[in-house]
């Protein structure tokens, strides 16, 4: 597996008149390959990455990733795994998916109800706090305040 990454904008060092005219005359992929020493990085999950610098003026890098097995050997086949997707009619899908969907909807409804209860309770408590601050709570106190 190889990945070619390049910067579409030329770097500041390549903006001189001779190099910019060379850039305009020849396509960017036709430039000669300058291979430097590879930088290999090995991670914990046995994937090694190696990078080679192709052309320093264009800033292109080829990155190769290879997954090694448990014993460190190369993978046996280099073919890409083929995924087989079969078209199944909706009528023939198992009923479990419908039951699972209904179960998720039920759980969602319960969560929404609980959230609504919490919101309403918080609103009630805020209203009570404001009324206490103004001296209008508890409601039995209102009868006493009428005579004043």
Curated annotation (Swiss-Prot):
Compartmental location: Plastid, Chloroplast
Tell me the residues of the organelle transit peptide. Answer: 1-65
UniProt region (Disordered), positions on chain? 125-148
UniProt keyword terms in alphabetical order: Acetylation, Chloroplast, Plastid, Ribonucleoprotein, Ribosomal protein, Transit peptide
Q: Does the keyword section mention Disulfide bond?
A: no
An example Gene Ontology CC term for this record: ribonucleoprotein complex
Which residues are recorded as modified (N-acetylalanine)? 66
Biological processes per GO annotation: plastid translation; ribulose bisphosphate carboxylase complex assembly
The source's superkingdom equals Eukaryota
Asked if NAD is a keyword of the record, the answer is: no
* UniProt xrefs under InterPro entries: Ribosomal_cL37
Description of how the protein assembles with itself and partners:
Part of the 50S ribosomal subunit.
Similarity section: Belongs to the chloroplast-specific ribosomal protein cL37 family.
UniProt protein name: Large ribosomal subunit protein cL37
State the organism named in the record. Arabidopsis thaliana (Mouse-ear cress)
């Amino acid at each position: 597996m190889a990945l070619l990454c390049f910067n579409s904008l030329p770097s500041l060092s390549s903006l001189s008149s001779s190099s910019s005219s060379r850039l305009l005359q020849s396509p960017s992929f036709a430039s000669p390959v300058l291979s430097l020493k590879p930088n290999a990085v090995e991670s914990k999950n046995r994937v090694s990455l190696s990078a080679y610098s192709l052309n320093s003026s264009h800033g292109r890098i080829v990155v190769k990733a290879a997954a090694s097995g448990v014993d460190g050997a190369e993978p046996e086949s280099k073919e890409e795994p083929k995924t087989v997707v079969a078209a199944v009619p909706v009528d023939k899908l198992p009923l479990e998916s419908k039951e699972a969907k209904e179960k998720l909807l039920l759980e969602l409804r319960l969560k929404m109800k609980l959230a609504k209860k919490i919101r309403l309770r918080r609103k009630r408590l805020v209203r009570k706090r404001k009324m206490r601050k103004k001296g209008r709570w508890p409601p039995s106190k209102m009868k006493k305040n009428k005579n004043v």
